[in-house]
């Protein structure tokens, strides 16, 4: 992991070939670390990714009174009998996932103060559904001085229906309700594999949960949870990024460490674009021997096409044969990436939450800036398809979500270097 001012120099033209294995999911490990707050004792997480956000979450947990050790891919969390309830220190504001301590703290302490989180600049992501869910469980919530405050003498099960299948709200409500009195039903719950992973861990801690992976989750509250050991699910977004990188560079890449069913729609889309895709139990292979065909995409909550792979869909269509439309239905400001693609020569136009991409034969090199984790990765892969050498700046965003990104690309044959500022 590098510094804030590091940049990448990416020379285009290489055909990616070889194999790569994905680590545990960023969108899972941070929530699992928060779930460790629910039980006094030592919880161990394995297959953790070596990304910037894991030490940031460690700092959040340490600020709440935990002891946390990171040893390569293993994170060990020692949760005390008495937690601090106020997560209103600088580490909390640095990344979005810090808000997932709201539910566990309310459940354990009867009170939580969580600073409004930072993270990627990809649109408004309000906490209304998080707060509403806690209120339906019996808490009072308010926003004051840049923080969410939740208080509850006790939490009581409720029938909760989400307006939108928000991943973050589903996670916070799950963690708040596992020790609530009585039964909670959560309708229109998020169905993402990372939700299933969280429920698996909570169940191994003694929680009574049914229905994860479906739109309705039922939680029967228990009096107490116990610590556990848990292996983090593989990162489907990183795996999907490698899949698109193979297709865009007309490469041949085998990706391991991920169940291909978690990427069913992205892999089907790559087939439509002309790629050969072979799947096996714990991975897949993508081979592309020709220029991709333009393919329309629309992002939706799982099992739809993931918004986190939207930059890769735009990048693929930028060099494809034909015209395509990519529609963003999840985050309204995620097309900032398009401005940077235009610097690379992409022929695009934005209309509301649609972007029209007219494919060209080859992109051109320039200097571009990452605005978030996935946009940064998308720009690097697009630069691999450009003539000449592209400078990618603000790559600290990429370090937040992609372990050993440069090293993995180099192993696949890419000409990429990190320049340390």
Curated annotation (Swiss-Prot):
Chief localization class?
cytoplasm
Keywords attached to this Swiss-Prot or TrEMBL record, sorted alphabetically, are: Cell cycle, Cell division, Cell shape, Cell wall biogenesis/degradation, Cytoplasm, Peptidoglycan synthesis, Transferase
Annotated catalysed reactions? phosphoenolpyruvate + UDP-N-acetyl-alpha-D-glucosamine = UDP-N-acetyl-3-O-(1-carboxyvinyl)-alpha-D-glucosamine + phosphate
Class of enzymatic activity (EC top level): transferase
Residues the entry annotates as binding UDP-N-acetyl-alpha-D-glucosamine: 96, 308, 330
Active-site residues annotated for this sequence: 120
Gene Ontology MF terms in the entry: UDP-N-acetylglucosamine 1-carboxyvinyltransferase activity
Cellular component (GO) terms are: cytoplasm
- Leader peptide range in chain numbering: none
Biological process per Gene Ontology, one example term:
cell division
**Binding of phosphoenolpyruvate, residues:** 26-27
> Which EC numbers does the record give?
2.5.1.7
Provide the protein's localization: Cytoplasm
Matching Pfam families, A to Z? EPSP_synthase (PF00275)
What NCBIfam families does the entry give?
murA (TIGR01072), PRK09369.1 (NF006873)
Purpose of the protein: Cell wall formation. Adds enolpyruvyl to UDP-N-acetylglucosamine.
Listed HAMAP family: MurA
Q: Which PANTHER family match?
A: UDP-N-ACETYLGLUCOSAMINE 1-CARBOXYVINYLTRANSFERASE
Similarity comment: family membership:
Belongs to the EPSP synthase family. MurA subfamily.
Under which name does UniProt file this protein? UDP-N-acetylglucosamine 1-carboxyvinyltransferase
């Amino acid at each position: 992991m590098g510094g804030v001012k590091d940049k990448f120099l990416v020379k285009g033209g290489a055909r990616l070939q070889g194999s790569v294995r994905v680590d545990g999911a960023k969108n899972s490990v941070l929530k699992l670390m928060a779930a460790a707050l629910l039980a006094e004792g030592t919880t161990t997480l394995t297959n953790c990714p070596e990304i910037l956000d894991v030490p940031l979450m460690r700092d959040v947990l340490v600020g709440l009174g935990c002891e946390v050790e990171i040893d390569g891919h293993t994170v060990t969390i020692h949760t005390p009998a008495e937690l601090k309830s106020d997560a209103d220190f600088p580490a909390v504001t640095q990344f979005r996932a810090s808000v997932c301590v709201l539910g566990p703290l309310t459940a354990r302490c009867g009170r939580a103060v969580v600073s409004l989180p930072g993270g990627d600049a990809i649109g408004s992501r309000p906490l209304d559904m998080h707060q509403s869910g806690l209120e339906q469980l019996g808490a009072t919530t308010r926003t004051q001085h840049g923080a969410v405050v939740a208080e509850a003498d006790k939490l009581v099960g409720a029938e909760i229906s989400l307006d939108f299948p928000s991943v973050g709200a589903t996670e916070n409500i799950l963690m708040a309700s596992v020790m609530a009195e009585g039964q909670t039903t959560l309708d229109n719950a998020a169905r993402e594999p990372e939700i299933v992973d969280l429920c698996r861990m909570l169940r191994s801690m003694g929680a009574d949960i049914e229905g994860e992976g479906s739109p309705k989750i039922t939680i029967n509250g228990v009096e107490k949870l116990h610590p556990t050991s848990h292996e983090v699910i593989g990162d489907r977004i990183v795996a999907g990024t490698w899949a698109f990188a193979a297709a865009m560079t007309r490469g041949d890449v085998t990706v391991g460490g991920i169940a291909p069913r978690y990427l069913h729609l992205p892999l089907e889309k790559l087939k439509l674009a002309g790629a050969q895709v072979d799947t096996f139990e714990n991975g897949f292979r993508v081979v592309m021997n020709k220029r991709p065909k333009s393919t329309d995409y629309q992002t939706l909550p799982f099992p739809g096409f993931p918004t986190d792979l939207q930059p890769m869909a735009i990048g693929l269509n930028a060099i494809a044969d034909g015209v395509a439309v990519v529609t963003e239905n999840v985050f309204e400001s995620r097309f900032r990436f398009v401005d940077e693609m235009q610097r690379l020569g992409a022929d695009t136009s934005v209309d509301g939450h649609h972007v029209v991409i007219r494919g060209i034969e080859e992109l051109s090199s320039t200097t571009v800036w990452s605005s978030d984790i996935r946009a940064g990765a998308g720009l690097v892969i697009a630069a691999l398809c450009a003539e000449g050498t592209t400078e990618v700046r603000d790559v600290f965003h990429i370090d937040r979500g992609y372990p050993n990104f440069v090293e993995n690309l180099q192993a696949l044959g890419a000409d990429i270097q990190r320049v340390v500022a």
